[in-house]
Amino acid sequence: MALFSSQAQAFNQTRQTYLARELALANTHWTRLRGLLGTSRSDFRNGCGLWIVPCRGVHTLAMRFAIDVVYLDRAQAVVHIEQDLRPWRFAPVRLQAASVLELPCQTIAGTGTAVGDKIEISLGKDARRQLD
């Protein structure tokens, strides 16, 4: 199960709105492979998210709920979005993506997030150490 932290957040600078106020980081082989597997829909509530680095595509195999997916380039600009990706599906691989945000359904629609938006990822000190 992903460990969501209120110290790590994803903020849409273009729309001036939060995509995730509690963000988990998946940046090792194991955490990227596991992703949200084992996370319940009630644990993955509005305001939560998973940032997968590096990542160019995702799947929802063995998941029990749908998600929204935001693909980010190296500058953390949105290059593609997938809304309501249902369980047992593959999202397209986007070669221009450097990372992906997995979010609860309706996050993209609720925030108005669109291709070209700039996303700021702020990490707590523990998460920053994991990226180094």
Spans of model-derived segments:
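Compact, glycine-rich, soluble single-domain proteins
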Residues: 1-132
